From Swiss-Prot:
Required cofactor(s): Zn(2+)
Name of the gene: Rabggtb
Provenance organism: Rattus norvegicus (Rat)
Protein purpose: Catalyzes the transfer of a geranylgeranyl moiety from geranylgeranyl diphosphate to both cysteines of Rab proteins with the C-terminal sequence -XXCC, -XCXC and -CCXX, such as RAB1A, RAB3A, RAB5A and RAB7A.
Keyword terms of this UniProt record: Acetylation, Metal-binding, Phosphoprotein, Prenyltransferase, Repeat, Transferase, Zinc
One BP annotation, GO: endoplasmic reticulum to Golgi vesicle-mediated transport
Protein name: Geranylgeranyl transferase type-2 subunit beta
Record's keyword annotation contains Zinc: yes
Amino acid sequence: MGTQQKDVTIKSDAPDTLLLEKHADYIASYGSKKDDYEYCMSEYLRMSGVYWGLTVMDLMGQLHRMNKEEILVFIKSCQHECGGVSASIGHDPHLLYTLSAVQILTLYDSIHVINVDKVVAYVQSLQKEDGSFAGDIWGEIDTRFSFCAVATLALLGKLDAINVEKAIEFVLSCMNFDGGFGCRPGSESHAGQIYCCTGFLAITSQLHQVNSDLLGWWLCERQLPSGGLNGRPEKLPDVCYSWWVLASLKIIGRLHWIDREKLRSFILACQDEETGGFADRPGDMVDPFHTLFGIAGLSLLGEEQIKPVSPVFCMPEEVLQRVNVQPELVS
């Protein structure tokens, strides 16, 4: 007998319409409660939190409700002498938060707020001889950081600052027999890493190196009877994988391989009808992270009330058109 499949049951009274205004109100009020326990405890990833909130507000056409000046001052104060950006004031710089900062500034058309040359030098300094990237000076290697590096430089128009060929070589060395990618060579395939690697290969024009049918099959197997998607076998579904899996499928031209209606129902069931926002699963606590990826997933599914989203950068397509960054996808 095989292992029993892990899944959730969606109740008959679960939300089935998009509560857009409630989500906008939830995000708009989130940053104003600066003495909340939840807000204080998320300081270590604040820069990414700001990116999640601003991006989802822009996708909903509500960016004007956020305090642009306060955010720009915050980002400027998080850039370090080395060029990298930290999650919050007084924290160490990291590639993850450097990308988030560049995404926010691109959203606001305010890249001048930081020293771009120093950002480029910082990204450059984190590339290793084998082409991989460390996330920071402490040296953890992960394909997520390869994506962060090329995404940051692509938005700045400085992709030629690194050894792109070696970077491609490293990412391809992380490809597995099932078509997926792990965090390092030999690591298990995981939907989050697959998103990073397919996004990386889209930015570097190397998607022809991917076996789209094999990878598409692995990604489609992430869909469970509830309609939700998990990140790897034997895991529960989670709204954030509505983004990582769906965006990867869009990048490799296989979005039509999953049951879109069942996924849409699962995402909508994860809304909180009282507070607004999305949770990882129906009935759980909402947060800005799952709210962005729920809304972005619905955008990829063609939700007309939401702006079209870039499957590579998780930013509004109109923003990327403005800065002329258009990675090629598999048609």
